[in-house]
């Protein structure tokens, strides 16, 4: 997660979006504030799992013993893309937007982000999380109404 965090920070710096780091976690929360009443959050997991990647493909993990399984690298890339597009079009927004790059999804580390106040200043009214899945057809999305922040 430490190398992933550094890559996220570098990209956010390149596009010019502000972000907050948290002392007890590798979490990053970027935000676009426009003094709006409502704030929407977008969330993706950034953690690697302690698994050796056995397939010898171009995109294989370069770090032995860890890999971004379950699509975590895709989740991070998608959220970074959302940061870029929404920041470039911030004049069209009618809400503040917070982007949650959450570490330790598999072990419930979202709890530490919440304890450190990531849902405040401005208060977040709703969060949309994302997860890629092989059970979802290409060009489709699946929406569930539930409360989760692992």
Language-model features: where?
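Acidic/His- and Gly-rich active-site-bordering loop/insert found
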Residues: 1-68, 77, 85-93
